[in-house]
């Protein structure tokens, strides 16, 4: 009953828009030569209200479908449950077949043979059978059959075999029953779950039905209001048509009287009127053809409505025959209803468009006489303007092409400038890092120099006390080399050794860095090499007296450059000390010429990149060596053996910064790579 009520409501919903369309087709207006009155404007407002109401109803229906789901989902669920039930039924059937086979085998085994019956008739076994029958009356048929089969056998071994077989069969039956019990328990749980799901779906369906009933009632009310409005509009339009026809007939009679009076003068006007009448006839014919077309469309819609009604009757019969197809038909009908609503909306829109066209034709008919005179002039001016615009368009196209080419060139130049800027920033960072390293080394060497000054002053104090001894030593110095000169020579040798060690350490670090970027694949290591090559300044020529020692002095002076404010002035004794320095022998290690010069691997900075500040100029005045740090009274100073190991230790600490094998250098290299 509920399903029948629902289908009837759907029929009402589907028939209502067709009836509205029929009423509207009957009430279509005739082309009028006057503009719309204020009554037409007021009638447009309820049309908007009806459209809003229909949209709200459609939204409510979509919300119901979304919340309670469509019929397709329910059909899919039923299909899945049916598919799961099929293999379960097959399993149950197989289990029942196996049980039947076991029962048949037992019945065949339990059938007595004729030979056994003859043996049972013996008088010796009759008494025992009576006793066993009394015992087995309470056990049942199975126990009696088992005892009969045991009595038929003679030996106890056969009886034991039979008992073992029977026990094995019973075990198999017991296991099969347990499996079946587990399966039935699972099946029961599934059925309970399905029952809960079906109950929830049933409740949801009831709620959906109640909401759909309320929607149907609202639609019926809406359809009634629409019918009343269409009837009122039809009446108003009929009255307007009558007024327009009366007015038109009066104007025609007046025109005929004027034509009779002034027929000779107004022949030209008659011709124009005939032409206009022909145009009016053509417009009226077109409108009639459109009305006929609309009537055909409405008839087609009525036929479709009849077909839909027939389909609904068939669906009701099918509902009585098979309830399973109810959900599919429900979905089908809902889809059809939505389609019909959309079609009704489209027809309403077409009707409004046609009415607007009719009003436009009426206005154009009034203004047609005025526009004919002005059209030729406007057409000529329009042609001239079009020619001017074509010329302007050609010029603008040329300008756009030139500007596009300029824009592309500017983009390419800008990309090149960005790449150059990135390279220059990397180089600048490398320069800054190297400058910081050199400043740290200069500070360390200044501290060493200050310590040496202190030691020299401490050594000068006992020399002033023993002035006589110093004068004698000066006299002897003219003839033979004194102990102070020997001490100075030893200090020079120690300084040379320190320089060699620093040079070797620096060379080892360069080798380690050159082996890593051999393929040139890592850009970070290549940048580190470029920065290290740039940081090696050139030494003045007067400090490199010997070719082998010159390389060492250049490498050490790179790390000992300091501001010229803290450096002592070079004296005349410097030249004598440099001349007295021993030349390198075969035992001294010669540093390989692997240190890159600043001009070999360093790119020349362009004008756009900021140059680093000139903190350390490589001039003879501002780049002092260890030989310049020695003061004038060094020649008279005795040999101090205690100060050299400390200096060597400090130099070794400085050399550790350059040796890659030690962990401190590894940390420094990693920091440099991170900065690059």
From Swiss-Prot:
Principal localisation: cytoplasm
Covalent S-S links between cysteines: none
Keywords on record: Coiled coil, Cytoplasm
One Pfam family, short name: Taxilin
Compartment annotation: Cytoplasm
Coiled-coil ranges from the UniProt annotation: 157-461
GO biological process, one term: positive regulation of neuron projection development
Biased composition (Polar residues): 8-25, 34-45
GO CC term (a single one): sarcomere
Residue segments, region Disordered: 1-55, 71-131, 464-486
Keyword Cytoplasm tagged: yes
GO molecular function, one term: syntaxin binding
Entry annotated with the keyword Oxidoreductase: no
Expression across tissues: Specifically expressed in skeletal and cardiac muscle.
Family to which this protein belongs: Belongs to the taxilin family.
Role, per record: Promotes neurite-outgrowth. May be involved in intracellular vesicle traffic.
Protein name: Beta-taxilin
Organism for this UniProt entry: Gallus gallus (Chicken)
